[in-house]
């Protein structure tokens, strides 16, 4: 219990409390301002809309006008964000609140409530009430995950989406309609997190869940596009440009040395670029590694014996491997690694049984680097010249130490696939 208390204090101090001190500018302000622009018939992806609809109860940053005029706002600051139009429909309840500060505090309160709901659901579906020691360990580990701390401090939409994703997975068997609606919301806000989950449900042939989810998503999309069409807003070109610029040279999504914050990314290209030194080769290598792991996952998935009543532990292992692999090929920031709650749950479940315990312990060791924002910390130490030049320029520092979180994800994916293979062998032999 003491471990949980310490982890909870760390979570509150490094998460919600930090957010309360950064209300003037954070990751949530741009999506809300863009939603206000959408509601008023303006282009939500146009930098000028940010200045026009910026909340009056907070100070507008000085860089907003200067970077907007110079055309570097997206490259330098990542705003306007390239969230899909469906996100504006879902964020409308916060955008219609006149006071930004009230909306922001309600947002962080809702995210905290969803996080707590996810913790309770983990205990219920994982039957941790019968294995309290493992349940306490899991609770402390989830509270200690640095991606959640970073996400809460920034007000990132990811910290709302990941608990929704977990609840959708937990309820997929017994509450298909609820799970489908939650999945649609996840895709509407962050497609790169929601689509792998929908793909998993499709492979499980949960057709009712799939159709309900796609129907809800279609309704949300129609509302979003119709509002833009009624006002004759030429949004599509700016949306495409925002996505292009976000991943372009020198942007916050750039995985090369042109982005001084690149080690805050966790996609595989950060690592492959350090190794090969060429953007095109890094992209090809990153996609190839993720593709190979994805094919291995599919092979093991279809080799898994079919069961009418799927075992929660095996389902958690399977979806854990899928989510870890999904983090590798495309743009993901550090807080998206909050998806590591899935392998954390499985690892704590695996500790109960001797045959799986080894894989579970190795998985916990590989998740350990994510209890601190290591890449960002090392990046700041290097930038502040706290790391000797001889060390900072050495191959082992650049290839192993700086991208250590990506190495951990790669190895974790391999361990989870190995655990899937071991489970399949055990089931087939019995």
What are these regions (language model features)?
Residues 180-184, 192-204, 212-214, 339-340:
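Transmembrane-embedded, aromatic-rich helix segments that form part
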């Amino acid at each position: 219990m003491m471990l949980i208390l310490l982890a909870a204090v760390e979570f509150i101090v490094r998460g919600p409390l930090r957010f309360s001190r950064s209300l003037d500018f954070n990751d949530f302000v741009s999506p809300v301002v863009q939603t206000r622009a959408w509601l008023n018939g303006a282009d939500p992806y146009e930098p000028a809309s940010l200045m026009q609809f910026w909340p009056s109860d907070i100070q507008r940053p000085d860089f907003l006008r200067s970077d907007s005029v110079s055309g570097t706002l997206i490259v330098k600051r990542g705003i306007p964000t390239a969230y899909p139009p469906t996100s504006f429909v879902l964020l409308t309840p916060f955008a219609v609140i006149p006071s930004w500060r009230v909306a922001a505090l309600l947002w962080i309160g809702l995210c905290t409530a969803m996080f707590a709901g996810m913790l309770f659901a983990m205990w219920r579906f994982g039957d941790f009430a019968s294995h309290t020691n493992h349940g306490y360990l899991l609770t402390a580990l989830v509270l200690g995950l640095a991606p959640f701390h970073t996400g809460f401090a920034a007000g990132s939409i990811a910290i709302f989406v990941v608990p929704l994703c977990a609840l959708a997975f937990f309820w997929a068997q017994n509450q298909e309609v609820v799970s489908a609606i939650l999945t649609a919301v996840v895709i509407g806000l962050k497609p790169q997190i929601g689509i792998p989950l929908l793909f998993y449900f499709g492979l499980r042939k949960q057709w009712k869940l799939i159709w309900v989810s796609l129907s809800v998503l279609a309704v949300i999309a129609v509302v979003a596009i119709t509002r833009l069409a009624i006002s004759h807003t030429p949004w599509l070109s700016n949306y495409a440009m925002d996505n292009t610029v976000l991943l372009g040279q020198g942007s916050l999504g750039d995985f090369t040395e042109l982005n001084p914050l690149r080690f805050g990314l966790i996609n595989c290209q950060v690592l492959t670029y350090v190794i090969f030194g060429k953007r095109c080769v890094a992209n090809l290598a990153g996609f190839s590694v993720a593709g190979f792991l994805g094919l291995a996952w599919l092979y093991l998935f279809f080799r898994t014996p079919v069961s009418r009543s799927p075992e929660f532990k095996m389902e958690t292992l399977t979806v854990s491997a899928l989510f870890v692999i999904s983090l590798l090929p495309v743009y993901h920031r550090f807080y998206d690694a909050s998806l590591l709650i899935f392998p954390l749950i499985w690892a704590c479940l695996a500790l109960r049984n001797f045959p799986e315990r080894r894989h579970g312990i190795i998985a916990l060791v590989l998740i350990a680097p994510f209890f601190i924002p290591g890449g960002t910390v090392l990046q700041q130490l290097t930038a502040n010249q706290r790391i000797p030049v001889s060390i900072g320029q050495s191959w082992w520092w650049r290839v192993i130490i700086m991208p250590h979180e990506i190495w951990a994800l790669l190895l974790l994916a391999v361990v989870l696939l190995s655990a899937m293979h071991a489970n399949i062998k055990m089931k087939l032999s019995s």
